[in-house]
A protein has these predicted regions:
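Active-site-proximal gating segment of KS-fold condensing enzymes and close homologs
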Residues: 7-29, 41-51, 128, 271, ...
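C-terminal catalytic domains of large/alpha subunits in multi-subunit enzymes
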Residues: 20-27, 54-60, 89, 114-234, ...
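Conserved beta-alpha junction segments in alpha/beta enzyme cores
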Residues: 1-19, 109, 116, 230-254, ...
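Thiamine diphosphate
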Residues: 13, 36-57, 61-64, 271-279
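Active-site cavity-forming subdomains of large catalytic enzyme subunits
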Residues: 66-131
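Generic structural signal for well-ordered beta-strand positions
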Residues: 94, 259, 423-426
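Short loop/turn motifs at secondary-structure junctions and domain boundaries
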Residues: 75-79, 241-242, 404-408
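Catalytic phosphate/nucleotide-handling subdomain of diverse soluble enzymes
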Residues: 238-300, 315
Length: 558
């Protein structure tokens, strides 16, 4: 039995292969954790821990030091991106050409998959009729690079959003108007030729985010104030070349409460609470009467990885199906006992009642006990299959790589000290269409957390390497944002009901971070009067741009 902080319970199979044991001999329990962000998607300690336990025949605890973790675990891929964008003088995009190079480090790990995501998102949320993208991932002697929140989308977002601001300056057009003219709409195709089957609502997300920043402020003394924007499309659901699936079990206890069993690892994103909320909604139960059992490879149905913003989409739909069948059993039992038509039975607050006759009602406990006594326990195991498997033609790059996408926009306000180059983000607003909020507090927290994490990437975080060796493998010199660095964040959630998740929901875990660095880059570049495109946007890099400004044109005030 292994207990590991992981995003993938299926790693028990890797341990079994290493130990040359039948898969059923290895049990993996997922530990509670506050975040994974891709760093716990790879096999990390599982096989080492399994070997130690097998050889010593004793309990073993394996804990990495901060330095060991920095050195031994995957990082976000460093990218070099070269873009050229063509447009008419009226601002309609005509063509985009991109060269994308990622540093894989010493091993491939998930680098090919990350690069594929970059290819799919290379043109962002824009309508571009002619596209050419060449992408390469290369081996180097640098630390291994692997999965990290947004999985290749954040790097391309920086490139295409920087191009949109540069193009706006070149043709003398308001950058918001330029985006509005070229945003994808229902029926348009993305770079791979996939046709969007729902309305992205990009114009509204941009306007709402921009307005949420509030009144424009003027800088004082050496401080310049500017605003920037980042819009994005980010897929939710896994690109796995086979049809993705997830399973869940929902059952009623004799006291009328419900239990959900699903192996979806909860990595701090509210996966467990969302599955409980779905069950409660379908069955007509108070949320506190639904219990979740998960994180155990032996006792919960396979649900796949907590990666790719897929768990609400996949496991959420599996729970929705299973709970729907349980509801049908409860309704049929109630109809029989209350001598009514199933169409007239309502489920509310743990009771089944005849519509229009509230005195004709029974608690769920009575229904479950009666069904169980007849050998019909009220429990269902069900499976959800994604609508389609990813398809990409390797010769043309065309196809349908994902079932759906989440669209959104972030806007930021920055202060830049023209004497020191120091940058401070003072306001941040984000607007996304999430389809349907299953747990609004959790969704808002995802967006706030993703945005602050994105600020860290934009301004602070940098792995310093010398001959392939990390020179700052600790949190003393590798800076991450704290509460003192976090600006006020305004989150606006739109609910179009157009998603493929339960009740029309869309995933938000990774999209919450995608456009943040791009928005900060555009704001800082506007304040500096010249492009600042190397991340992080350190004081030295900003100061260099301040000393060599290029006159802006066609930009919105502020």
């Amino acid at each position: 039995v292994l207990r590991v902080s992981t995003q993938v319970l299926e790693h028990f199979r890797d341990v079994a292969e290493v130990l040359q044991l039948p898969h059923g001999r290895v049990r993996l329990e997922g530990a509670y954790l506050g975040g994974g962000f891709g760093g716990k998607e790879d096999v990390t300690v599982e096989c080492l821990l399994g070997l130690l336990v097998w050889k010593t025949r004793r309990p073993v605890q394996l804990v990495f030091s901060r330095e060991e973790s920095f050195i031994g675990h995957g990082k976000r891929h460093p990218y070099v991106l070269r873009y050229k964008t063509g447009a008419t003088r009226s601002g309609e995009l005509v063509a985009m050409e991109a060269e994308v190079i990622s540093d894989s480090g010493a091993y491939a790990a998930l680098s090919p998959w990350v690069l594929l995501y970059s290819l799919v998102t290379a043109t962002g949320p824009y309508r571009v009729p002619n596209v050419k993208v060449d992408a390469h991932t290369v081996y180097t002697n640098n630390p291994i690079a692997s999965a990290y929140r947004t999985f290749g989308s954040i790097q391309t977002c920086v490139a295409y959003e920087g191009q949109m601001d540069a193009l706006a300056r070149a043709i003398g057009m308001d950058p918001l108007l330029l985006r509005e003219k070229n945003f994808l709409r229902k029926g348009d195709s993305i770079a791979t030729g996939q046709v969007l089957e729902s309305e992205p609502m990009l114009g509204e997300t941009m306007r709402r985010a921009w307005e949420a920043l509030g009144p424009v402020r003027a800088g004082e003394g050496p401080v310049r104030i500017a605003r920037g924007l980042g819009a994005s499309l980010t897929p939710y659901g896994r690109m796995c070349w086979t049809r993705d699936s997830a399973s869940a079990w929902v059952g009623m206890e004799l006291d009328g409460t419900a239990v959900v069993r699903c192996a979806a690892p909860d990595v701090g994103g509210g996966q467990t609470s969302s599955l409980c909320s779905i069950t409660a909604e379908i069955l007509g139960l108070p949320l506190e009467q639904v219990t979740a059992v998960g994180r155990d490879s032996h006792f919960t149905p396979r649900a796949g990885t907590t990666t790719a913003t897929r768990q609400l989409f996949m496991s959420g739909n599996a729970v929705l199906k299973a709970a729907g069948e349980v509801r049908r059993h409860l309704v049929d039992q109630a109809a029989e006992m209350l001598e009514a038509s199933p169409a007239d039975i309502e489920l509310l607050d743990g009771r089944a009642m005849v519509r229009g006759a509230p005195d004709r009602a029974l608690p769920f406990s009575a229904l479950v006990r009666a069904a169980t006594a007849r050998g019909r326990p009220v429990q269902v195991l069900d499976k959800y299959d994604a609508p389609s498997a990813p398809t990409i033609d390797p010769a043309t790059g065309q196809g349908k790589p994902f079932n759906d996408y989440t669209f959104g926009t972030q806007a930021v306000e920055v202060e830049v000290d023209e004497e020191t180059g120091q940058t401070r983000v003072t306001r941040l607003a984000a607007c996304y269409d999430i389809g349907q909020a299953i747990n609004r507090q959790s969704a808002e927290g995802q967006v706030e957390g993703g945005a602050i994490q994105g600020l860290g990437h934009a301004i602070l975080e940098e792995v310093v390497l010398e001959d392939g060796v990390s020179k700052n493998p600790h949190l003393l010199d590798y800076k991450i944002p704290t509460t003192l660095d976090a600006p006020p964040v305004v989150v606006v959630l739109l609910e179009s009901g157009q998603g493929l998740g339960p009740f029309g929901a869309k995933g938000i875990g990774e999209p919450a971070m995608t456009p943040t660095p791009a928005a900060v880059m555009n704001a800082v570049s506007r304040a500096a009067g010249a492009p600042v495109v190397q991340f992080p946007l350190t004081a030295e890099r900003v100061l260099a741009a301040l000393k060599h400004p290029s006159p802006p044109s066609g930009e919105r005030a502020g």
